[in-house]
């Protein structure tokens, strides 16, 4: 061999191996068929009919086995899978090219990640609580697998189940053997049969074993889930086909002025990082314009109403009336929601029909029962009074509906609430009373008599630093055919009678309560969840798992929970 060829060979050997990407494509299955959500067609080993409404889980600890039996660890990768949200892909990048004999991953995350501060994660990170909805709030730690749904026993009586697998000891390794040809980018298609989680090596019966688990030590349901998980996964194929991935295009800010001042958004260090709009960065000039427009009666047809008319600042921007009232005294159909911590929401109104704040802000202006004004008329009126303000907030003084929406969005995004007595207590600046502390413990504790846990179970829907999960739920009110909530938007049967979960921050000053303002006091709200829950087909599983009527709280428990709820009032609204 010539010296030149030898040098070339040595050079090639010294170069790093080619890096490839292994894509994972999950297929949610049930009884060897594609999973159909909210479909009571599946059977437990005990013959109980059940439906799945939620299958959400975390994956981590990825590794590939080499031919010699050693493992290539890929520890930085974390993925969130969710059947309802259609989250079913992951990608393992920078994998050395070659052939591997197995893929390993874990359902759940490692102890360090589980104990870490969830507020550290980027707005789009799988472990951001606002993304995955799987962080266990002030208790700490993540839910590794959330499996929820409805079921019926032999007597046909409806019920709900809520299985939450969590805690470090229950992190479960899954090993899928196969021929992983990664000489180039490839895709591993993986089946996850949800039904096998319930009827695998240790089959579960809702009637016999129980309808909920929070994975307390020694819980046999959690142990059964861990035993069943490995058998629920199967490797279908490994191919060189790579799934199409939508590339994120560059987003340019809309109409920024030549000179502007960035706005410093204030929020608690416990809050998740919010997904702020990249095309509408917060600047002081645009926020100021948005606040001016929020209080401008020119947005209404007869000049009598502004946004603030139904959303007064002193009531945490909530409407104190049962139903909102528009121009000429026209009564609306729903109660006006409070307007704070909106930066963490991705859909707006009680039914979620607006996908952004800029769109939401323009709807009441045009609604016949609210401001009842045409946008072209608003543009004309504002063009006579606010062009100078638009010139400061945008790259020209032009007034347009889009710019009105962007300015209102900017202002609304800045309305954060994070300085309550509870927040100060968490910072060590104040101390909760004995009754308030008892209420906090009840709020954050599951009600699971099977395991001796008798909490108020509030945290499932109202957990986390924001005290809401931003989901749509049927919370046990009788279904009104005149207002079916989220169903109006999606037309999905599972959404009949579901409405947006409101934050419980400032709850003491945002009465009346519910989408129709039916309850005027917190006592009435607690009575509803204690004894007044109506069992319907779409009742949320976290309520349907309880006995007929609800939680059946004692008078002392109700008082304690209410005492805690009153600690969630921001100091800006405490003197209302």
Which residues are covered by each model-predicted region?
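N-terminal signal peptide c-region/cleavage motif recognized by signal peptidases
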Residues: 14-16
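Sec/Tat-exported extracytoplasmic proteins
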Residues: 63-66, 104-107, 151, 198, ...
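A short, solvent-exposed, low-complexity linear motif enriched for acidic/polar residues
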Residues: 20-252
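Stable alpha-helical elements in mature extracytoplasmic
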Residues: 58, 96, 286, 303-306, ...
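Sec-dependent signal peptide recognition
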Residues: 2-9
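Short glycine/threonine-rich turn/loop motifs
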Residues: 252-363, 423-541, 574-576
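Second-shell loop/turn segments in exported
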Residues: 90-91, 276-279, 296, 366-369, ...
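C-terminal capping alpha-helices of c-type cytochrome domains
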Residues: 375-419, 508, 518-576
């Amino acid at each position: 061999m010539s010296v030149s060829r030898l040098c070339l060979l040595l050079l090639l050997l010294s170069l790093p191996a080619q890096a490839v990407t292994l894509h994972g494509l999950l297929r949610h299955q049930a009884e060897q068929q594609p999973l159909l959500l909210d479909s009571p067609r599946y059977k437990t080993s005990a013959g109980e009919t059940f439906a799945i409404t939620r299958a959400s889980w975390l994956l981590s600890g990825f590794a590939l086995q080499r031919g010699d039996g050693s493992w290539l660890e890929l520890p930085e990768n974390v993925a969130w899978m969710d059947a309802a949200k259609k989250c079913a892909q992951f990608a393992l990048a920078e994998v050395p090219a070659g052939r591997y004999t197995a893929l390993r991953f874990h359902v759940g995350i490692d102890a360090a990640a589980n104990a870490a501060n969830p507020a550290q994660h980027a707005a789009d990170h799988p472990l951001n609580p606002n993304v995955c909805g799987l962080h266990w709030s002030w208790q700490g730690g993540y839910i590794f697998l959330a499996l929820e749904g409805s079921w019926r026993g032999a007597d046909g009586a409806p019920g709900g189940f809520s299985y939450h697998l969590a805690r470090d000891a229950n992190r479960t390794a899954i090993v899928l053997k196969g021929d992983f040809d990664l000489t180039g980018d490839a895709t591993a298609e993986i089946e996850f049969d949800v039904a096998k989680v319930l009827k695998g090596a240790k089959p579960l019966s809702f009637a016999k074993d129980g309808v909920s688990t929070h994975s307390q030590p020694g819980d046999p349901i959690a142990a059964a889930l861990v035993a069943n998980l490995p058998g629920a996964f199967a490797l279908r194929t490994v191919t060189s086909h790579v799934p199409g991935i939508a590339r994120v295009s560059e987003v340019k800010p809309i109409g920024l002025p030549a000179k502007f001042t960035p706005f410093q958004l204030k929020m608690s260090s416990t809050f998740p990082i919010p997904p702020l709009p990249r095309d509408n960065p917060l600047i002081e000039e645009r926020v100021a314009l948005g606040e001016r427009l929020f209080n401008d009666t020119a947005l209404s047809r007869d000049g009598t109403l502004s946004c603030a008319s139904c959303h007064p600042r002193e009531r945490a921007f909530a409407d104190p009336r049962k139903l909102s009232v528009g121009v000429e005294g026209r009564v609306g159909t729903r109660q006006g929601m409070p307007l704070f911590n909106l930066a963490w929401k991705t859909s707006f109104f009680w039914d979620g029909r607006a996908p952004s704040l800029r769109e939401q802000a323009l709807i009441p202006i045009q609604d016949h029962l609210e401001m009842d004004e045409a946008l072209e008329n608003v543009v004309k009126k504002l063009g006579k009074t606010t062009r100078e303000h638009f010139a400061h907030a945008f790259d020209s003084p032009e007034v347009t509906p889009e710019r009105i929406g962007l300015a209102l969005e900017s202002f609304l995004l800045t309305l954060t609430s994070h300085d309550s007595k509870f927040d100060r207590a968490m910072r060590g600046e104040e101390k909760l009373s004995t009754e308030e502390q008892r209420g906090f413990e009840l709020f954050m504790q599951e009600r699971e008599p099977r395991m001796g846990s008798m909490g108020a179970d509030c945290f499932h829907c109202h957990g986390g630093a924001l005290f809401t999960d931003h989901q749509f739920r049927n919370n046990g009110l009788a279904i009104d055919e005149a207002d079916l909530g989220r169903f109006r938007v999606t037309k999905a049967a599972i959404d009949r009678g579901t409405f947006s979960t409101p934050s419980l921050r400032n709850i003491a000053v945002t009465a009346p309560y519910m989408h129709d303002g039916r309850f005027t006091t917190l006592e009435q709200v607690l009575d509803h969840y204690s004894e007044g829950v109506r069992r319907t087909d779409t009742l949320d599983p976290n309520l349907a798992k309880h006995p007929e009527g609800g939680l059946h709280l004692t008078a002392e428990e109700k008082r304690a929970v209410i005492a805690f709820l009153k600690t969630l009032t921001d100091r800006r609204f405490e003197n209302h």
